[in-house]
Amino acid sequence: MSVLEVLKERGYIAQMTHEEEIEKLLEKEKITFYIGFDPTADSLHVGHLIQIMTMAHMQRAGHRPIVLLGGGTALIGDPSGRTDMRKMLTKEEIDRNAEAFKKQMERFIDFSEGKAIMENNAKWLLGLNYIEFLRDIGVHFTVNRMLEAEAFKTRMERGLTFLEFNYMLMQAYDFLELYRRYGCVMQMGGNDQWSNIIAGVELIRKKEGKQAYGMTFVLLTTSEGKKMGKTEKGAIWLDPKKTSPYEFYQYWRNIGDADVEKALALLTFLPMDEVRRLGRLRDKEINEAKKVLAFEVTKLVHGEEEALKAQKAAEALFEGGGEMEHVPSIEVSQDIIGRKIVDVLFEAKVIPSKSEGRRLIQQGGLYINDKRVENVDECIKEEMVKENAILVRKGKKEYHRLLVKE
């Protein structure tokens, strides 16, 4: 099975610029392709996993990925899929974020000699001469055509800054630079990047007289069309300091029944026969498929050891087996005895704010050792400490252990 057939079967592909040509190209040659990642945060998140998995599938088939870190484009901010302008970051923040992205990418992509390339578009964008850029690149873009792009259409009513309007030119120029430097003939990205990718394909044709290609992927959404990887707390991050491996595991363990097969196909390397078998499970049996999904995605992102720990923690809490030591734990001192539960949990970062803690108690959603906390002013009592620990539960499924130091 060709890599294109694999990507189609698993449900990655949204659009392609030249489907038949791409099919022949990927079968006959080993190509260089790229995907861009603007380092606008200090960690990759679940939404990036589709691009990462596609790169990994392509690399396994012998093609060479370029991971392009947007050290230059992040200074502008991509308006695609945005209803408002992104917060402007400093160059120092972007450089720090790019370094974090780089380390995370190495978990998924083999960067050994000749296998893959890591680049940063700051290398060529930051030194551009504005007049020369307009004469050399800007001349090939018509404003009429640019305004037809979905990314700009959705922003015209609310206001699109000239800064953001330049983003398409910058991304197209990236593709041209990578074509010239590395013979990169294909750009891939999320489906919200379609207009920007086409702009790059056309720029290469106009400047070099050569054919380049584009491919976009589906966005990671639930069966209800909502973005996957978002919770009440915010994004599900790939950095274990921002989202613990246990929280990460639990997110996948608790996704909707209708989303299990899609997530298994897109976010694991399990054979499709197994994916389909797991996807056919119903009622209580679907929980087995969710456990497989949670373990496989956690293993991919955090490694097998952390995935096993998360699995054991979940078993300890929800099935009465396993080991409590793997449940997310926070050390606290003995002087918590007699203090308000809300204050202690806020200081231990179990709740984001004291008002959120009070709201949780009023709604009957906070438990200490599986006993509901009834009063917002309730204090920690000595008898709550069992074997030097207090088990805290928020809602139905979020657990934390407070380890009381002697």
Curated annotation (Swiss-Prot):
Catalytic activity: tRNA(Tyr) + L-tyrosine + ATP = L-tyrosyl-tRNA(Tyr) + AMP + diphosphate + H(+)
Motif ('KMSKS' region): 227-231
Name this protein carries in UniProt: Tyrosine--tRNA ligase
Gene Ontology, cellular component aspect: cytosol
EC numbers: 6.1.1.1
Positions contributing to L-tyrosine binding: Y34, Y167, Q171
Origin: domain of life: Bacteria
InterPro entries from the UniProt entry: aa-tRNA-synth_I_CS, aa-tRNA-synth_Ic, Rossmann-like_a/b/a_fold, S4_RNA-bd_sf, SYY-like_C, Tyr-tRNA-ligase, Tyr-tRNA-ligase_bac-type, Tyr-tRNA-ligase_bac_1
Native organism: Caldanaerobacter subterraneus subsp. tengcongensis (strain DSM 15242 / JCM 11007 / NBRC 100824 / MB4) (Thermoanaerobacter tengcongensis)
GO molecular function: ATP binding; RNA binding; tyrosine-tRNA ligase activity
